[in-house]
Protein backbone atom coordinates (compact mmCIF):
# COMPACT_ATOMS: atom_id res chain seq x y z
CA UNK A 1 0.00 0.00 0.00
CA UNK A 2 1.46 3.36 -1.04
CA UNK A 3 1.86 6.02 1.63
CA UNK A 4 -0.46 8.98 1.11
CA UNK A 5 -0.38 12.13 3.24
CA UNK A 6 -2.72 15.07 3.66
CA UNK A 7 -1.77 18.71 4.17
CA UNK A 8 -4.19 21.60 4.77
CA UNK A 9 -3.87 25.37 4.42
CA UNK A 10 -6.38 28.20 4.76
CA UNK A 11 -6.91 31.71 3.50
CA UNK A 12 -9.32 34.53 4.27
CA UNK A 13 -10.87 37.25 2.13
CA UNK A 14 -10.16 40.97 2.19
CA UNK A 15 -13.39 41.38 4.18
CA UNK A 16 -12.24 39.20 7.07
CA UNK A 17 -11.84 41.37 10.22
CA UNK A 18 -8.13 40.65 10.65
CA UNK A 19 -7.52 41.43 6.99
CA UNK A 20 -9.46 44.69 7.22
CA UNK A 21 -7.04 45.66 9.98
CA UNK A 22 -4.01 44.61 7.91
CA UNK A 23 -5.21 46.60 4.91
CA UNK A 24 -5.86 49.73 6.97
CA UNK A 25 -2.39 49.49 8.55
CA UNK A 26 -0.74 49.10 5.15
CA UNK A 27 -2.88 51.84 3.58
CA UNK A 28 -1.60 54.20 6.28
CA UNK A 29 1.97 53.04 5.63
CA UNK A 30 1.59 53.61 1.88
CA UNK A 31 0.08 57.06 2.37
CA UNK A 32 3.03 58.07 4.56
CA UNK A 33 5.68 56.58 2.24
CA UNK A 34 4.15 58.39 -0.73
CA UNK A 35 5.09 61.68 0.97
CA UNK A 36 8.08 60.59 3.07
CA UNK A 37 10.02 57.51 1.85
CA UNK A 38 12.35 57.76 4.87
CA UNK A 39 9.52 57.43 7.41
CA UNK A 40 9.59 54.86 10.19
CA UNK A 41 6.13 53.37 10.66
CA UNK A 42 4.59 50.79 12.97
CA UNK A 43 0.82 51.16 12.58
CA UNK A 44 -1.55 48.75 14.29
CA UNK A 45 -5.31 48.59 13.74
CA UNK A 46 -8.18 47.09 15.70
CA UNK A 47 -11.67 46.83 14.17
CA UNK A 48 -14.98 45.83 15.70
CA UNK A 49 -18.65 46.72 15.34
CA UNK A 50 -18.88 50.35 14.27
CA UNK A 51 -15.36 51.29 15.33
CA UNK A 52 -11.74 51.41 14.15
CA UNK A 53 -8.79 52.14 16.43
CA UNK A 54 -5.41 52.96 14.87
CA UNK A 55 -2.39 53.09 17.17
CA UNK A 56 1.37 52.72 17.08
CA UNK A 57 4.60 54.61 16.55
CA UNK A 58 5.51 56.80 13.57
CA UNK A 59 8.42 59.12 12.77
CA UNK A 60 7.72 61.14 9.62
CA UNK A 61 7.57 64.57 8.04
CA UNK A 62 4.37 63.61 6.21
CA UNK A 63 0.87 64.66 7.12
CA UNK A 64 -1.93 62.31 6.13
CA UNK A 65 -5.65 62.27 6.79
CA UNK A 66 -5.89 59.00 8.69
CA UNK A 67 -9.66 59.29 8.95
CA UNK A 68 -9.98 59.45 5.16
CA UNK A 69 -7.46 56.66 4.55
CA UNK A 70 -9.39 54.37 6.91
CA UNK A 71 -12.78 55.12 5.35
CA UNK A 72 -11.53 54.77 1.77
CA UNK A 73 -9.95 51.41 2.59
CA UNK A 74 -13.14 50.08 4.18
CA UNK A 75 -15.21 51.25 1.20
CA UNK A 76 -12.82 49.64 -1.28
CA UNK A 77 -13.16 46.31 0.53
CA UNK A 78 -16.94 46.54 0.21
CA UNK A 79 -18.29 47.57 3.60
CA UNK A 80 -20.58 50.32 2.33
CA UNK A 81 -23.95 49.29 3.79
CA UNK A 82 -25.13 50.14 7.31
CA UNK A 83 -26.85 46.75 7.57
CA UNK A 84 -23.40 45.11 7.61
CA UNK A 85 -22.84 46.61 11.08
CA UNK A 86 -19.63 48.19 9.81
CA UNK A 87 -19.63 50.73 6.98
CA UNK A 88 -17.12 53.18 5.59
CA UNK A 89 -19.01 56.39 6.27
CA UNK A 90 -20.60 55.60 9.63
CA UNK A 91 -17.74 53.84 11.41
CA UNK A 92 -15.99 55.68 14.23
CA UNK A 93 -12.26 56.22 13.61
CA UNK A 94 -9.99 56.68 16.63
CA UNK A 95 -6.30 57.34 15.83
CA UNK A 96 -3.64 57.29 18.54
CA UNK A 97 -0.18 57.50 17.01
CA UNK A 98 3.01 58.63 18.76
CA UNK A 99 6.63 59.13 17.72
CA UNK A 100 8.97 56.14 17.57
CA UNK A 101 11.06 55.55 20.70
CA UNK A 102 14.37 57.39 20.60
CA UNK A 103 16.10 54.35 22.08
CA UNK A 104 14.97 52.22 19.14
CA UNK A 105 15.56 54.96 16.59
CA UNK A 106 19.22 55.43 17.52
CA UNK A 107 20.01 51.81 16.66
CA UNK A 108 18.05 51.93 13.41
CA UNK A 109 19.41 55.28 12.27
CA UNK A 110 23.02 54.35 13.06
CA UNK A 111 23.87 50.66 13.19
CA UNK A 112 26.50 49.18 15.49
CA UNK A 113 28.84 48.72 12.51
CA UNK A 114 28.55 52.40 11.63
CA UNK A 115 29.21 53.46 15.21
CA UNK A 116 32.32 51.26 15.18
CA UNK A 117 33.72 52.97 12.09
CA UNK A 118 32.26 51.12 9.08
CA UNK A 119 31.79 53.84 6.44
CA UNK A 120 29.78 51.75 3.97
CA UNK A 121 26.44 53.49 3.39
CA UNK A 122 24.61 50.15 3.57
CA UNK A 123 25.99 49.54 7.06
CA UNK A 124 24.41 52.72 8.36
CA UNK A 125 20.94 51.29 9.07
CA UNK A 126 20.56 48.74 11.85
CA UNK A 127 17.84 46.13 12.14
CA UNK A 128 14.72 47.57 13.76
CA UNK A 129 14.46 44.60 16.10
CA UNK A 130 15.94 41.21 16.82
CA UNK A 131 14.22 38.22 15.30
CA UNK A 132 14.22 35.32 12.89
CA UNK A 133 12.54 35.22 9.50
CA UNK A 134 11.85 32.44 7.00
CA UNK A 135 11.39 32.32 3.26
CA UNK A 136 10.29 29.29 1.28
CA UNK A 137 9.84 28.01 -2.26
CA UNK A 138 8.83 24.66 -3.75
CA UNK A 139 8.24 23.46 -7.29
CA UNK A 140 4.58 22.46 -6.74
CA UNK A 141 3.13 25.42 -8.64
CA UNK A 142 4.33 27.80 -11.39
CA UNK A 143 4.80 30.53 -8.78
CA UNK A 144 6.87 28.09 -6.66
CA UNK A 145 4.45 28.01 -3.73
CA UNK A 146 2.87 25.10 -1.85
CA UNK A 147 -0.33 24.01 -3.60
CA UNK A 148 -2.68 24.14 -0.56
CA UNK A 149 -2.11 27.84 0.19
CA UNK A 150 -2.04 28.73 -3.50
CA UNK A 151 -5.49 27.20 -4.06
CA UNK A 152 -6.85 28.65 -0.81
CA UNK A 153 -5.87 32.18 -1.88
CA UNK A 154 -7.33 31.71 -5.35
CA UNK A 155 -10.68 30.59 -3.92
CA UNK A 156 -11.25 33.66 -1.75
CA UNK A 157 -9.98 35.96 -4.48
CA UNK A 158 -12.50 34.38 -6.84
CA UNK A 159 -15.28 34.97 -4.31
CA UNK A 160 -14.30 38.64 -4.10
CA UNK A 161 -14.29 38.96 -7.90
CA UNK A 162 -17.80 37.47 -8.15
CA UNK A 163 -19.04 39.73 -5.34
CA UNK A 164 -17.58 42.93 -6.76
CA UNK A 165 -18.70 42.20 -10.32
CA UNK A 166 -22.24 41.48 -9.11
CA UNK A 167 -22.28 38.04 -10.73
CA UNK A 168 -23.26 36.59 -7.34
CA UNK A 169 -25.27 39.45 -5.91
CA UNK A 170 -25.95 38.04 -2.45
CA UNK A 171 -22.30 37.74 -1.39
CA UNK A 172 -20.95 39.93 1.41
CA UNK A 173 -17.27 40.74 2.04
CA UNK A 174 -16.27 38.25 4.78
CA UNK A 175 -15.12 34.78 3.67
CA UNK A 176 -12.71 31.96 4.47
CA UNK A 177 -11.33 29.03 2.50
CA UNK A 178 -9.46 25.86 3.41
CA UNK A 179 -7.96 23.25 1.10
CA UNK A 180 -6.66 19.79 1.98
CA UNK A 181 -4.31 18.31 -0.61
CA UNK A 182 -3.32 14.65 -0.81
CA UNK A 183 0.33 13.88 -1.52
CA UNK A 184 1.82 10.62 -2.76
CA UNK A 185 4.79 8.75 -1.33
CA UNK A 186 7.14 11.07 -3.24
CA UNK A 187 5.54 14.18 -1.72
CA UNK A 188 3.89 15.12 -5.01
CA UNK A 189 0.34 16.54 -4.90
CA UNK A 190 -2.08 14.15 -6.56
CA UNK A 191 -5.59 15.31 -5.65
CA UNK A 192 -7.65 17.69 -3.55
CA UNK A 193 -9.25 15.79 -0.70
CA UNK A 194 -11.37 18.51 0.96
CA UNK A 195 -12.47 22.07 0.27
CA UNK A 196 -14.06 24.23 2.97
CA UNK A 197 -15.57 27.60 2.08
CA UNK A 198 -17.51 29.85 4.41
CA UNK A 199 -18.84 33.00 2.79
CA UNK A 200 -20.94 35.78 4.25
CA UNK A 201 -24.23 36.31 2.43
CA UNK A 202 -27.48 38.27 2.37
CA UNK A 203 -30.24 36.78 4.57
CA UNK A 204 -32.46 35.75 1.65
CA UNK A 205 -29.84 33.49 0.03
CA UNK A 206 -30.56 29.78 0.50
CA UNK A 207 -27.98 27.17 1.44
CA UNK A 208 -28.71 25.19 -1.73
CA UNK A 209 -28.16 28.25 -3.90
CA UNK A 210 -24.93 29.16 -2.11
CA UNK A 211 -23.61 25.61 -2.37
CA UNK A 212 -24.34 25.34 -6.08
CA UNK A 213 -22.85 28.73 -6.91
CA UNK A 214 -19.72 28.18 -4.83
CA UNK A 215 -19.03 24.73 -6.28
CA UNK A 216 -19.71 25.67 -9.90
CA UNK A 217 -18.48 29.28 -10.05
CA UNK A 218 -15.71 29.24 -7.47
CA UNK A 219 -14.26 25.80 -6.78
CA UNK A 220 -14.48 24.39 -10.31
CA UNK A 221 -13.28 27.69 -11.76
CA UNK A 222 -10.17 27.66 -9.58
CA UNK A 223 -9.12 24.07 -8.90
CA UNK A 224 -7.94 22.10 -11.96
CA UNK A 225 -10.32 19.24 -12.80
CA UNK A 226 -7.45 16.74 -12.54
CA UNK A 227 -7.30 17.40 -8.79
CA UNK A 228 -11.03 16.83 -8.21
CA UNK A 229 -12.72 13.44 -8.11
CA UNK A 230 -15.84 11.75 -6.79
CA UNK A 231 -14.26 11.45 -3.34
CA UNK A 232 -13.40 15.15 -2.98
CA UNK A 233 -15.43 16.58 -0.11
CA UNK A 234 -17.01 20.05 -0.22
CA UNK A 235 -18.08 21.83 2.98
CA UNK A 236 -19.87 25.03 1.98
CA UNK A 237 -21.04 27.25 4.86
CA UNK A 238 -21.16 24.20 7.13
CA UNK A 239 -22.69 26.15 10.05
CA UNK A 240 -25.78 26.65 7.90
CA UNK A 241 -25.87 30.46 8.02
CA UNK A 242 -23.32 33.28 7.69
CA UNK A 243 -25.22 36.58 7.54
CA UNK A 244 -23.51 38.33 10.45
CA UNK A 245 -19.85 38.69 9.56
CA UNK A 246 -16.96 41.09 9.31
CA UNK A 247 -16.25 43.22 12.38
CA UNK A 248 -19.88 42.87 13.47
CA UNK A 249 -19.28 39.17 14.00
CA UNK A 250 -15.66 39.20 15.18
CA UNK A 251 -13.12 41.82 16.13
CA UNK A 252 -10.04 42.08 13.94
CA UNK A 253 -6.42 43.00 14.65
CA UNK A 254 -3.36 43.66 12.53
CA UNK A 255 -0.93 40.76 12.33
CA UNK A 256 -3.21 37.85 13.27
CA UNK A 257 -3.04 36.07 9.91
CA UNK A 258 0.70 35.52 9.58
CA UNK A 259 0.36 31.96 8.27
CA UNK A 260 -2.18 33.05 5.66
CA UNK A 261 0.26 35.82 4.70
CA UNK A 262 3.10 33.38 4.04
CA UNK A 263 3.06 29.65 3.22
CA UNK A 264 -0.04 28.25 4.86
CA UNK A 265 1.94 26.40 7.51
CA UNK A 266 3.97 24.43 4.96
CA UNK A 267 7.13 26.26 6.05
CA UNK A 268 8.32 27.50 9.41
CA UNK A 269 7.53 31.04 10.56
CA UNK A 270 9.55 33.37 12.78
CA UNK A 271 6.44 34.88 14.36
CA UNK A 272 6.70 38.47 13.15
CA UNK A 273 3.82 40.09 11.28
CA UNK A 274 4.18 42.34 8.22
CA UNK A 275 1.38 44.88 7.81
CA UNK A 276 1.83 48.45 9.01
CA UNK A 277 5.63 48.14 9.21
CA UNK A 278 8.14 50.02 7.07
CA UNK A 279 11.10 48.17 5.60
CA UNK A 280 13.52 48.93 8.45
CA UNK A 281 11.49 46.35 10.36
CA UNK A 282 13.21 43.11 9.39
CA UNK A 283 10.10 41.14 10.34
CA UNK A 284 8.84 42.34 6.99
CA UNK A 285 11.81 43.16 4.78
CA UNK A 286 13.93 40.13 5.71
CA UNK A 287 10.96 37.81 5.20
CA UNK A 288 10.63 39.21 1.70
CA UNK A 289 14.37 38.79 1.14
CA UNK A 290 14.24 35.19 2.37
CA UNK A 291 11.41 34.41 -0.08
CA UNK A 292 13.42 36.09 -2.86
CA UNK A 293 16.42 33.90 -2.08
CA UNK A 294 14.42 30.67 -1.78
CA UNK A 295 12.49 31.27 -5.00
CA UNK A 296 15.64 32.00 -6.99
CA UNK A 297 17.39 28.92 -5.57
CA UNK A 298 14.54 26.68 -6.71
CA UNK A 299 14.16 28.44 -10.06
CA UNK A 300 17.90 27.96 -10.63
CA UNK A 301 17.47 24.21 -10.29
CA UNK A 302 19.71 24.12 -7.22
CA UNK A 303 16.92 22.49 -5.18
CA UNK A 304 13.27 21.52 -5.62
CA UNK A 305 12.39 22.80 -2.15
CA UNK A 306 14.21 25.50 -0.18
CA UNK A 307 13.67 27.19 3.16
CA UNK A 308 15.87 30.15 4.09
CA UNK A 309 16.24 31.45 7.63
CA UNK A 310 17.67 34.88 8.40
CA UNK A 311 18.20 36.26 11.90
CA UNK A 312 19.11 39.71 13.22
CA UNK A 313 20.12 41.61 16.36
CA UNK A 314 18.50 44.98 17.01
CA UNK A 315 20.68 47.87 15.91
CA UNK A 316 23.08 45.61 13.98
CA UNK A 317 23.21 45.64 10.18
CA UNK A 318 24.63 42.23 9.31
CA UNK A 319 22.43 39.19 9.95
CA UNK A 320 23.62 37.02 12.81
CA UNK A 321 22.82 33.88 10.81
CA UNK A 322 21.90 32.67 7.33
CA UNK A 323 20.66 29.12 6.87
CA UNK A 324 19.46 27.23 3.80
CA UNK A 325 17.53 23.98 4.25
CA UNK A 326 16.64 22.06 1.09
CA UNK A 327 15.24 18.94 2.79
CA UNK A 328 17.62 16.71 0.87
CA UNK A 329 16.68 18.11 -2.55
CA UNK A 330 19.74 20.25 -3.34
CA UNK A 331 22.17 19.47 -6.15
CA UNK A 332 25.13 20.73 -4.09
CA UNK A 333 25.85 20.79 -0.33
CA UNK A 334 23.76 23.29 1.62
CA UNK A 335 26.92 24.95 2.92
CA UNK A 336 27.75 25.80 -0.69
CA UNK A 337 24.29 27.32 -1.18
CA UNK A 338 24.68 29.40 1.99
CA UNK A 339 28.03 30.73 0.79
CA UNK A 340 26.55 31.53 -2.62
CA UNK A 341 23.62 33.33 -1.00
CA UNK A 342 25.99 35.52 1.02
CA UNK A 343 27.86 36.38 -2.20
CA UNK A 344 24.79 37.29 -4.24
CA UNK A 345 22.48 38.96 -1.71
CA UNK A 346 23.27 41.92 0.56
CA UNK A 347 21.21 41.04 3.63
CA UNK A 348 21.83 44.16 5.68
CA UNK A 349 18.53 46.05 6.12
CA UNK A 350 19.72 48.88 3.85
CA UNK A 351 20.93 46.30 1.34
CA UNK A 352 17.54 44.59 1.30
CA UNK A 353 15.74 47.93 0.99
CA UNK A 354 17.93 48.91 -1.96
CA UNK A 355 17.79 45.47 -3.61
CA UNK A 356 13.98 45.26 -3.47
CA UNK A 357 13.23 49.01 -3.68
CA UNK A 358 11.17 48.93 -0.50
CA UNK A 359 10.72 52.64 0.23
CA UNK A 360 7.78 52.80 -2.19
CA UNK A 361 4.05 52.67 -1.34
CA UNK A 362 3.56 49.07 -2.51
CA UNK A 363 2.27 47.43 0.65
CA UNK A 364 -1.51 47.75 0.78
CA UNK A 365 -1.84 45.41 -2.22
CA UNK A 366 -0.06 42.68 -0.25
CA UNK A 367 -2.34 42.89 2.79
CA UNK A 368 -4.92 40.41 1.46
CA UNK A 369 -4.46 37.15 -0.48
CA UNK A 370 -0.85 36.60 0.56
CA UNK A 371 2.47 38.42 0.49
CA UNK A 372 4.25 35.56 -1.30
CA UNK A 373 3.67 33.86 -4.63
CA UNK A 374 1.44 36.59 -6.04
CA UNK A 375 0.84 36.37 -9.78
CA UNK A 376 -1.73 39.18 -10.00
CA UNK A 377 0.60 41.99 -8.90
CA UNK A 378 4.28 42.76 -9.50
CA UNK A 379 6.28 42.31 -6.31
CA UNK A 380 10.09 42.59 -6.41
CA UNK A 381 10.73 39.63 -4.11
CA UNK A 382 8.94 37.41 -6.64
CA UNK A 383 11.34 38.31 -9.46
CA UNK A 384 13.69 35.62 -10.78
CA UNK A 385 16.57 37.94 -11.63
CA UNK A 386 19.17 36.28 -9.38
CA UNK A 387 19.09 32.82 -10.95
CA UNK A 388 22.18 33.25 -13.11
CA UNK A 389 24.13 34.97 -10.34
CA UNK A 390 23.39 32.11 -7.94
CA UNK A 391 24.48 29.48 -10.46
CA UNK A 392 27.75 31.34 -11.05
CA UNK A 393 28.31 31.87 -7.32
CA UNK A 394 27.86 28.15 -6.67
CA UNK A 395 30.57 27.44 -9.26
CA UNK A 396 32.99 29.83 -7.57
CA UNK A 397 32.33 28.33 -4.14
CA UNK A 398 32.85 24.81 -5.43
From Swiss-Prot:
Q: Superkingdom of this entry's organism?
A: Bacteria
* Co-factor note (free text): Binds 2 divalent ions per subunit. Binds 1 potassium ion per subunit.
Q: Please give the biological process terms from Gene Ontology that the record holds.
A: one-carbon metabolic process; S-adenosylmethionine biosynthetic process
Q: Which GO terms describe its cellular component?
A: cytoplasm
Specify whether Signal is a keyword of the entry: no
- GO MF assignments: ATP binding; magnesium ion binding; methionine adenosyltransferase activity
Entry keywords, A to Z: ATP-binding, Cytoplasm, Magnesium, Metal-binding, Nucleotide-binding, One-carbon metabolism, Potassium, Transferase
Q: By its UniProt entry, which Gene3D superfamilies does this protein fall under?
A: 3.30.300.10
Q: Which InterPro entries match?
A: ADOMET_SYNTHASE_CS (IPR022631), S-AdoMet_synt_C (IPR022630), S-AdoMet_synt_central (IPR022629), S-AdoMet_synt_N (IPR022628), S-AdoMet_synthetase (IPR002133), S-AdoMet_synthetase_sfam (IPR022636)
> Which annotated residues bind K(+)?
44
Report the principal subcellular site.
Answer: cytoplasm
Its needed co-factors are: Mg(2+); K(+)
Identify the metabolic or biological route this protein is part of: Amino-acid biosynthesis; S-adenosyl-L-methionine biosynthesis; S-adenosyl-L-methionine from L-methionine: step 1/1
Detail which positions bind L-methionine: 57, 100, 250, 281
Assembly description: Homotetramer; dimer of dimers.
> Can you say what this protein is called?
S-adenosylmethionine synthase
Task: Point out the gene that encodes the protein.
Answer: metK
Amino acid sequence: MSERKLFTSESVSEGHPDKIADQISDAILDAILAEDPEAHVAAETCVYTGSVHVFGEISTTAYIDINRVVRDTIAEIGYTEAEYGFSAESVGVHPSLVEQSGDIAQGVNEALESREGDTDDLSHIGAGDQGLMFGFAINETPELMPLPISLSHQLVRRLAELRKSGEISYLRPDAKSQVTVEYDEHDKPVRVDTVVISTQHDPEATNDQIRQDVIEKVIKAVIPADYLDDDTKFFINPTGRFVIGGPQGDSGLTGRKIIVDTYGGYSRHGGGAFSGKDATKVDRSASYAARYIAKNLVAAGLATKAEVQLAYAIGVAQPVSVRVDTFGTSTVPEAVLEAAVRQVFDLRPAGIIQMLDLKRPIYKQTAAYGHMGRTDIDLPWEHLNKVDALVEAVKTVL
